[in-house]
């Protein structure tokens, strides 16, 4: 059983930190915002709530929601241009401080790559450090499904990405930070998990995370010591 002080040491000495995106790095759930633009917000946010609670296998929940939304390429571009996601207060400073310390920062999301890459660019995170789901479109821009081969399309996908990062870059200590059950499940293989409740509190995560924060300032403070 890792103590809180050991967790703090792990975070302080980590060589890689992975963040979830929706409701963690950004304030919104990207899929719900996309549903809003496509006019099916209510039905989809109810499905998201069920999926986040871990009641439905991730890929099934994603397939079901996307079948309802049917987002076109143009609608995705419109979302990014007209209603870009809002960064969670403190995240820009935290990522920048980690990068100054030569810590590799990754975004691992069950959301969509086009939206997550936009978020990454605001945080100076290279697109190569982004793992997310890819939407597919027909030549006329209509929705054609999503790439089911991405690890993030599966339940347990975030853990698969972290395992892959360890194998590829030989990281000694990887920290996963996120708001949801799928983030908590990624530890192990992550060496530590920090639950984040600054945008939404998921009771299951709050109850089970050994370290739970509601403000990124707390983590910034850990790096100053």
Curated annotation (Swiss-Prot):
Major subcellular location class: cytoplasm
Positions of modified residues (N-acetylmethionine): 1
Annotated positions binding phosphate: 53, 182
Effect on the protein upon substituting residue 202 to K: Reduces L-phosphoserine phosphatase activity by about 95%
Active site: 20, 22
Cofactor note: Binds 1 Mg(2+) ion per subunit.
Top-rank taxon, per record: Eukaryota
Binding site for Mg(2+): 20, 22, 179
Catalytic function, reaction form: O-phospho-L-serine + H2O = L-serine + phosphate; O-phospho-D-serine + H2O = D-serine + phosphate
Record note on what altering residue 65 to A/K does: Loss of L-phosphoserine phosphatase activity
Outcome of substituting residue 202 to A: Reduces L-phosphoserine phosphatase activity by about 99%
Annotated Pfam families: Hydrolase (PF00702)
GO BP terms: in utero embryonic development; L-serine biosynthetic process; L-serine metabolic process; response to mechanical stimulus; response to nutrient levels; response to testosterone
Disulfide bonds: none
Protein EC: 3.1.3.3
Keywords, comma-separated and alphabetical: Acetylation, Amino-acid biosynthesis, Cytoplasm, Disease variant, Hydrolase, Magnesium, Metal-binding, Serine biosynthesis
An annotated GO cellular component: cytosol
Effect recorded for residue 29 to Q: Loss of L-phosphoserine phosphatase activity
Top-level EC class as recorded in UniProt: hydrolase
UniProt-annotated binding residues for O-phospho-L-serine: 52, 109-111, 158, 182
Subunit structure: Homodimer.
Family according to the record: Belongs to the HAD-like hydrolase superfamily. SerB family.
Involvement in disease: Phosphoserine phosphatase deficiency: An autosomal recessive disorder that results in pre- and postnatal growth retardation, moderate psychomotor retardation and facial features suggestive of Williams syndrome.
Known function: Catalyzes the last irreversible step in the biosynthesis of L-serine from carbohydrates, the dephosphorylation of O-phospho-L-serine to L-serine. L-serine can then be used in protein synthesis, to produce other amino acids, in nucleotide metabolism or in glutathione synthesis, or can be racemized to D-serine, a neuromodulator. May also act on O-phospho-D-serine.
This protein's name: Phosphoserine phosphatase
Organism from which the protein derives: Homo sapiens
Phylogenetic placement of the source organism: Eukaryota, Metazoa, Chordata, Craniata, Vertebrata
């Amino acid at each position: 059983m890792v103590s809180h002080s050991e967790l703090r040491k792990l975070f302080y000495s980590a060589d890689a930190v992975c963040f979830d995106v929706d409701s963690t790095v950004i304030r919104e759930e990207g899929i719900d915002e996309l549903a809003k633009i496509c006019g099916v917000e209510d039905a989809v946010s109810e499905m998201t709530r069920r999926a986040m609670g871990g009641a439905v296998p991730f890929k099934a929940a994603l397939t079901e929601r996307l079948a309802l939304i049917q987002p076109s390429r143009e609608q995705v571009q419109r979302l990014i241009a007209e209603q870009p996601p809002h960064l969670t207060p403190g995240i820009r400073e935290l990522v920048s401080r980690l990068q100054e310390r030569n810590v590799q920062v990754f975004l691992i999301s069950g959301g969509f790559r086009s939206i997550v890459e936009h978020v990454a660019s605001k945080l100076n995170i290279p697109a190569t450090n982004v793992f997310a789901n890819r939407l597919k479109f027909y030549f006329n821009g209509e929705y054609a499904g999503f790439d089911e081969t991405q690890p993030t399309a599966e339940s347990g996908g975030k853990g698969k990405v972290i395992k892959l990062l360890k194998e590829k870059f030989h990281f000694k200590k990887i920290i996963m930070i996120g708001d949801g059950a799928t983030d908590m499940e990624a530890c192990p293989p992550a060496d530590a998990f920090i639950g984040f409740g600054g945008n939404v509190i998921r009771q299951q995560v709050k109850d089970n995370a050994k370290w739970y924060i509601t403000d990124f300032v707390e983590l910034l403070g850990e790096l100053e010591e």
